[in-house]
Structure formats: C-alpha cells, structure tokens
Amino acid sequence: MNTNRAFEEAVPQVPGLDFVVLAMPYTLLDQDCLHRGLARCLREGISVVIGSPFASGILAKGSRGGGNCDYGQAPEAVVTKVQGMEAVCARHGVSLPAAALQFPLEHLAVASVVSGAKRPDQVEMNVRALGEATPTAFWSELRTNELVDPEAPTSE
C-alpha cells in the first residue's frame, strides 16, 4: 500500500492478515501511520514490511542528489526537511541512508525493510547502512528539531 489512507482502510477488511507491505507512509520523512495503522498492526499481530524506506530515493541520494520523493520530484519543503536531517546526520557521523533504513525497523510491528537496489554497489551500501551505528543523541536531536514524530520508536 502506498498511502496511509489505503493502509488504514484495507487492514481492517482482511481478517487473519499475517503481514502487509507498506510502500510510503512510514519513513524517516513521513510517520503519518504511526498512531493508527501501525498501532493497529501491533495490537493485532500483523507484521509490516516497509517497501520504500528511502522515500523513492531522496533518503538514499540526499538533498543534492536529485532523488525523488513519493514517486515524483521532491517538493521544496521535503528538500528542506532532508537538509535538516543531513545536518543532524553530519553532527553525529551517521549517513542518511543508515538513518532511513534503520528508522522503520525500530517499530515493533515492522518485520523487515525492502531497500531495493539496481546495482551491486547499492546492495553493498544498504548492507553497510544497516550495520552503521546510530547513537541515541542522533535520534534525540531529530526529535528536538521536529524532524521525526516525537513518539516514533528509536533505539534509546
């Protein structure tokens, strides 16, 4: 599912659902489904697979990399938010791709992320990013700067 609305409407209509693939509504950029959709999945034991942790590219390429967001050109507000995240990443020695891949995995309902890769070097980058340290102070600063939902679970 690619939207929070589709996620919230579809899950209750499928009894016995084991898992759902969620392609956009829970990323480092967007936590709209945190309080309802993901909370419901957690309550009902439905595992979530995050299918677009890089938000269509901008969280892998960064604000200067020409990455898309939500399957199109990133709006200026998104680019500005990513720049804020990049500044926090730089202060804590965390790469933006590491933050993007690790963030959704902190939620107890999330079982996996599908990062996607076109080339072998992208697979290698994803593996490195998953193993990268993301200190508690990093996540705290993202919250303090209102770059992520203050209630989003992270390793603290």
Description of each model-found segment:
Residues 1-155:
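Beta/alpha (TIM)-barrel catalytic core signal, keyed to glycine-rich beta->alpha loops juxtaposed to Asp/Glu
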